Swiss-Prot record:
Growth hormone plays an important role in growth control and is involved in the regulation of several anabolic processes. Implicated as an osmoregulatory substance important for seawater adaptation. This is Somatotropin. GO terms for molecular function: growth hormone activity; growth hormone receptor binding; metal ion binding. The modification Pyrrolidone carboxylic acid is found at residue 18. It comes from Morone saxatilis. Zn(2+) binds at residues 35, 186. It is found in: Secreted.
Length: 204
């Protein structure tokens, strides 16, 4: 029995002492950062929604379900099965575009200055990290083989002065889309990171 316990201890030590590659380290950092951004987006949306009247929530949710997020123009997997079939480079490239699409609109989010000041640097850091991962996984492939010159239109008219109702709708749309996109990026980066572990089950 003692011998078996000793053998298991040695095997466990061997597994835990496996070196972590630079790619795994970068992926871990990127996943943690987008997870924090996703949590922040969820909190901001929940706080804004709780400040609305019940009828306002219902109407805005109804309008949002009929609308599109600006980032919907970025071609991405339509479901979890397509996500799992996508290459690591494709998932990274889509994630990069999604993060990039929020660099300017995030400055107009109707949230407190403390939260808004957190978002821009977090997006910038995550974008830099994803770019490093793309470079490490490119292997001679073109970074954005599909529509590399894609230009996204601004989010609604957030740069213009709006009436109270339109301003409310704009804020709801921006926060809901921000939450949706951070969830997408977290999913894509988590699946891409999982691919580094051949024995891992990457089922969503």
């Amino acid at each position: 029995m003692d011998r078996a316990v000793l053998l298991l201890s040695v095997l466990s030590l061997g597994v835990s002492s496996q070196p972590i590659t630079e790619g795994q380290r970068l992926f871990s950092i990127a996943v943690e950062r987008v997870h924090n951004l996703h949590l922040l987006a969820q909190r901001l949306f929940t706080e804004f929604e709780s400040s609305l009247q019940t009828e306002e929530q219902r109407q805005l949710n109804k309008i949002f379900l009929q609308d599109f997020c600006n980032s919907d123009y970025i071609i991405s997997p339509i479901d979890k099965h397509e996500t799992q079939r996508s290459s690591v480079l494709k998932l990274l490239s889509i994630s990069y575009r999604l993060i990039e699409s929020w660099e300017f609109p995030s400055r107009s989010l109707s949230v407190g200055p403390a939260a808004r000041n957190q978002i821009s640097p977090k997006l910038s850091e995550l974008k830099t990290g994803i770019l490093l991962l793309i470079g490490a996984n490119q292997d001679g492939a073109e970074m954005f083989p599909d529509s590399s010159t894609l230009q996204l239109a601004p989010y609604g008219n957030y740069y213009q002065s709006l009436g109270a109702d339109e301003s409310l709708r704009r804020t709801y749309e921006l926060l809901a889309c921000f939450k949706k996109d951070m969830h997408k990026v977290e999913t894509y980066l988590t699946v891409a990171k999982c691919r580094l572990s051949p024995e891992a089950n990457c089922t969503l």
